[in-house]
Amino acid sequence: MKENELKNEKSVDVLSFKQLESQKIVLPQDLFRSSFTWFCYEIYKSLAFRIWMLLWLPLSVWWKLSNNCIYPLIVSLLVLFLGPIFVLVICGLSRKRSLSKQLIQFCKEITENTPSSDPHDWEVVAANLNSYLYENNVWNTKYFFFNAMVCQEAFRTTLLEPFSLKKDKAAKVKSFKDSVPYIEEALGVYFTEVEKQWKLFNTEKSWSPVGLEDAKLPKEAYRFKLTWFLKRISNIFMLIPFLNFLCCIYVSRGMCLLLRTLYLGWILFMLVQGFQNIRVLIMSMEHKMQFLSTIINEQESGANGWDEIARKMNRYLFEKKAWKNEEFFFDGIDCEWFFNHFFYRVLSAKKSMWPLPLNVELWPYIKEAQLSRSEVLLV
């Protein structure tokens, strides 16, 4: 009798395991070797790519019938080099157009599945939309979204930021028409989940540094900020821009001194801007919440307060493996500039700052962080 019960329990366990396996969410990232192979597959299946391939048929006939090969050669070279560019542009516009026509369905999926700012919450939304777009002949493959992060980014650039930047009802209706009530409901659900995440983050998931008294800011280790910056260029993300800068130095060797100085100065300025942008791009939503929480809870005022915030965040980002060392911020001044430039400044943004995020879901907490710094100064 006991053996039968054990067998039944095992069979139930196997069935439940199989049910869980069948319910497992499958996204293109699980099927393709990489995002590049997925991208190539999407291009291959696109109408623009097929048209580009068909263009070679009349060109081949022209080559065979023409007595003068110069004109066929010129056209062939144009098709060869400009064709792929047009294919990429058309495919990008086609994706944007296809998604913009399905905003209501996008909103329904968000309302039903209640995702937060955590990318994992968007897996169900991405999988459902992939199936819906393919089954309703909106898209020609089952793999519109490569993974949850791509779906979340599409939500940010298609719904969250454009809708939030519209200040009045008339502007929203003009841009989004019948989708407005669905978007409002979806954003309401999303903001509610983000608020839950923020409250949970500040209580159960709160982080406190250990041994921070031994931590030093880069300003204490480097004589000049330029030295610190040049060391940061060794980061793999900045390798290509830095090599490009060296190439510009070589190319500009024939210019007069004034033009060369202005040209190289502008290139170096763009390199610095690129480095600053990379810092905010590598921060996840959790990192940003920790940054704002650290600012709000810091008791020190003025420059000392920002130094403490910089020291804590340097340790935090290093422990979370978001940065390779404890030198994310040079000092408190750099930390304050980072907050004002990438967080507080976006509150008055009137248009998208792509590729930089507007962090719309963090606007209430950004205001709170700014207010907390002002109150500390007053005290």
From Swiss-Prot:
Its main location: membrane. InterPro entries: DUP/COS. It is a multi-pass membrane protein. This is Protein COS3. Residues 1-72, 276-379 are cytoplasmic. The chain crosses the membrane at residues 73-93, 255-275. It comes from the Eukaryota. Keywords: Membrane, Transmembrane, Transmembrane helix. GO terms for cellular component: endosome; fungal-type vacuole; plasma membrane. Belongs to the DUP/COS family. Pfam families: DUP (PF00674). Residues 94-254 are extracellular. It comes from Saccharomyces cerevisiae (strain ATCC 204508 / S288c). It is found in: Membrane. One of its GO terms (biological process) is intracellular sodium ion homeostasis.
